[in-house]
Amino acid sequence: MATATQKRKTTPAGISIAPDTLRKALATVRAAVGGMARPVLQNVYIGGGVVEATDLEMRISCEIDYQGPEILLPYARLSAILGAASSQEVLIGVGESSCTISIGSSKWTLPTEPATEFPAWSVADAARKPVARIPADQFARAVRSVSYAADNESSRYALGGVMVEVQDGSATFVATDGRRLSRYDVEIDQAVDPSATLWPSRAINTIAALASHSEGAVQLESAGSELIATIEGIVVASRVVEGRYPRWRDVFPEREASATVADRQEMLAATRQAAIVTSEQSKGVTYSITSEGISLAAKSSEAGESSVTCPILDFGQAATVKLDPVFVCDFLKACDDGEPVEIEAVDSSSAVVLRSGDCRGVIMPLCEE
């Protein structure tokens, strides 16, 4: 991202803007507003036809219909003012160290910092390399289906990101914390070179949230250590996650195994019921797969025992394995409605593979106590 030594040019004048336009822009850039450590980053920059916010780790800019002078405005107070007043027009007068905001008969005077203090950012078009163009709804679904498995607390920083691997006309989204892995494949309609980019979980979840409200496409690009996503006039930029990502394709076992099929909602409900008696010391649920159904059992000295049965739609092969119910629920909640779940388990010590629609997951078993 840009350093604080880079400055913007500014000229004194005023601003007239529709409140709904400004409210929408503030909501768009909210996730990138900085904290107390750098007071200038608690402001939003308005100028050059955009509203911008950055915390130096992520930057969001949103196009607005405004070509007036540059100004920094405090995000929190501006949001509160727009939320408390209603009018067809917001008038902002710019002074040397303050601004006035007028909405209808109400007026506020706020201290401001020079717009030149806001960190500038730019990437030459020649430096940008296309990664993929993905329909916004598919992008949001892909991120939702994998991001829960990333580990943002690990000392292995790479595990705190979501890998986007592009090859052979598809983009594969992957996340793992070392104990589970999630994968989702999306077809792309753009001819690009094969690539693998590791996106920070926070940034890619922000992009997905914005994409969920768009009917267009998400254009992903890389530029050195920067990753850039563009969605209908909104640009999100972030640093690439450093570190070596696991060889995730090796996690999916190559074996001959028959999967058992169950209704996703029934499997989710059964797992939640069985997990009621689990604890931090006894967190596992034992899944016993038979031709009669899936029996779920849990036990802890402080909370008691549970026994639940989940019916099946098709039987694969018998197996018993102990899994973390949180991991199972996370996978099932991320899958699309209406799709059954396939459970591929072979024994108590081997990884369990889950499939539902376009979602793929691997969960490592827990040791029997």
Label each PLM-derived region with a short phrase.
Residues 1-369:
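Structural preference for solvent-exposed beta-strand-turn elements
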